[in-house]
């Protein structure tokens, strides 16, 4: 899951859940500018695209995430996960010695929700490259599926599983995650978001405003989605490198 999540393969197909909607709305006082529109993605694709700091291209303009629609349900579902960036795992427990998952760093995670987009600029002819923010996504299997089949390919035992429950967690901008800066700057009360590329003074002002308005400190939160997917599971893979080779094959 982690390998496929990092490479952006997860998943576009065989997903049973609905999607996430990003809405761009023209302000009440504005008579010009981009028209109102919605972008929809499956939740696992949205986990990579609809995140603070990423740039979205649509309707001849560029847009960024400004606010998530965090209702009472989403706020109540904030929970602490434990992640180990070096070993590339995420768990709900402090550690699982059976699978070598110990020494994880705690981080609060909120379910990815529908969101509002803000207009940044118009797309110009000078833009030959489009920006896509690199993110760190970890995945884990949940204890539910709809059964399947087991077979062997060469030396590898493989299971074809239908409706396997998975959870994917976006820890933030990839380079900052490597430096130990986990999570996205989010207000857990109103859902306002700040890009990880903001300078410290901007982050400080953002935190101050939402502390005064919302009555709660702004923190770094991971974004999480759960889904059911059809999958091939290769057993007894010796290393991550071998897993990457098999996945790309």
Enumerate the predicted regions with their spans.
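Extended Lys/Arg-rich polyanion-binding regions
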Residues: 1-249
């Amino acid at each position: 899951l982690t390998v496929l999540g990092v490479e952006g393969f997860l998943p576009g197909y065989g997903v049973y859940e609905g999607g996430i909607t990003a809405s761009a709305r023209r302000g009440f006082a504005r008579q010009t500018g981009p028209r109102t529109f919605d972008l929809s993605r499956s939740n696992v694709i949205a986990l990579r695209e609809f995140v603070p700091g990423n740039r979205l291209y649509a309707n001849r303009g560029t847009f960024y995430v400004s606010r998530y629609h965090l209702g009472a349900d989403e706020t109540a579902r904030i929970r602490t996960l434990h992640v180990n960036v070096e070993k590339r795992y995420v768990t709900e427990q402090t550690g699982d010695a059976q699978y070598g998952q110990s020494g994880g760093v705690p981080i609060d995670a909120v379910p990815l929700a529908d969101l509002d987009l803000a207009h940044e600029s118009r797309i110009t002819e000078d833009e030959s490259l489009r920006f896509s923010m690199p993110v760190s996504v970890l995945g884990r299997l949940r204890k539910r599926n709809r059964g399947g089949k087991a077979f062997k390919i060469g030396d590898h035992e493989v299971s074809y599983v239908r409706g396997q429950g998975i959870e994917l967690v976006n820890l933030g901008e990839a380079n900052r995650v490597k430096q130990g800066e986990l999570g996205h700057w989010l207000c857990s009360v109103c859902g306002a978001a700040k890009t990880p590329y903001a300078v410290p003074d901007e982050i400080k002002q953002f935190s101050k405003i939402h502390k005064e308005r919302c009555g709660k400190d702004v923190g770094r939160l991971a974004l999480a989605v759960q889904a059911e997917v059809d999958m091939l599971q290769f057993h007894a893979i010796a290393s991550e490198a071998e897993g990457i080779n098999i996945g790309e094959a």
